[in-house]
Amino acid sequence: MAGSMAQSKWLAYCRLMRINKPIGALLLLWPTFWALWMAGKGIPDMHILLVFTAGVFLMRAAGCAINDFADRKFDGYVERTKTRPLPSGAISEKESKILFVVLALISFGLVLTLNKMAIWLSAVGLALAWLYPFVKRFSHFPQFVLGAAYGWAIPMGFAAVSESLPLECWLLFLVNIFWSVIYDTQYAMVDRNDDLKIGVKSTAILFGRFDKLIIGLLQLAMLLLLVLVGYLINLGGIYYWSLLLTGTLFIYQQKLIAGRERELCFQAFLNNNYVGLVLFLGIFFSYV
């Protein structure tokens, strides 16, 4: 009996950290890799690469823990989230907060092996990770905070590798903010009806009937910024082919969200993993 209860608790913790749903970690991992490869001119330091890769999965898990704590009074009313560990009672509020602190401390321990500039920047990253889940209570722009939180590994990566924050670093950071608004708006379109009932704010609600148009404009802006980044650091032709393929993926996403059907909007969200991968491959092979 005790063993069964322990296993059940462990599985609940795994669900809280979304170990069974790696898409969020991957959407955080790709921009981190973009930055490390660009900052390292195609040859990232192995120690730095390992620290950031581990940090991505740890901080994503920490972000899920604090997000579910912030949403604990709302998730029970949303079809997609009502079986999560907190609303279902499998994990207590105290346990979720302890998990967040433990994961954040382990992540900070890894950061301490980097240079001082990266260490100082990590404090901003932690603040953004904590802030995001609560922004949706009073603002329609939580996706912008998510973009900043998910993209903060970009300036941290440049700082860790080169101890500098060049123009391409901040352009790439802006690219990631646009991308985060794109995919998290698609994600929020899945829950829009439930969110309207319970008062949760999102860009999907703010954009209303212009949601598809604004997503399309952000996709175009993202591609134009990526062209500028490639020009600034002299990336090769294969990088621009990856941008063309990314544009094709964006067109496919527009087709998926055309009817605003829940399942298809979620598929559009998931498709962004391929966007991140294609862009990384374009950067990677430009340095080969």
From Swiss-Prot:
* InterPro entries recorded: HB_polyprenyltransferase-like, Prenyltransferase, UbiA_prenyltransferase, UbiA_prenylTrfase_CS, UbiA_sf
Q: Which GO terms describe its biological process?
A: ubiquinone biosynthetic process
Where it mainly occurs, coarsely classed, is membrane
Where in the cell?
Cell inner membrane
Topology term for the membrane:
Multi-pass membrane protein
Question: What keywords sit in the KW lines?
Answer: Cell inner membrane, Cell membrane, Magnesium, Membrane, Transferase, Transmembrane, Transmembrane helix, Ubiquinone biosynthesis
According to the UniProt record, what class of enzyme is this?
transferase
Naming one, the record's GO cellular component terms include: plasma membrane
What's the cofactor? Mg(2+)
GO terms assigned for molecular function: 4-hydroxybenzoate polyprenyltransferase activity
Transmembrane segment boundaries: 23-43, 46-66, 98-118, 119-139, 141-161, 163-183, 213-233, 238-258, 268-288
Name the Pfam families on file: UbiA
Q: Hey, which pathway is this one from?
A: Cofactor biosynthesis; ubiquinone biosynthesis
Q: Does the keyword Transcription regulation apply?
A: no
* Keyword set includes Cytoplasm: no
Reaction catalysed by this enzyme: all-trans-octaprenyl diphosphate + 4-hydroxybenzoate = 4-hydroxy-3-(all-trans-octaprenyl)benzoate + diphosphate
The superkingdom listed in its UniProt entry is: Bacteria
Q: What is its EC number?
A: 2.5.1.39
Q: What does this protein do?
A: Catalyzes the prenylation of para-hydroxybenzoate (PHB) with an all-trans polyprenyl group. Mediates the second step in the final reaction sequence of ubiquinone-8 (UQ-8) biosynthesis, which is the condensation of the polyisoprenoid side chain with PHB, generating the first membrane-bound Q intermediate 3-octaprenyl-4-hydroxybenzoate.
Which family is this sequence assigned to? Belongs to the UbiA prenyltransferase family.
Return the protein name. 4-hydroxybenzoate octaprenyltransferase
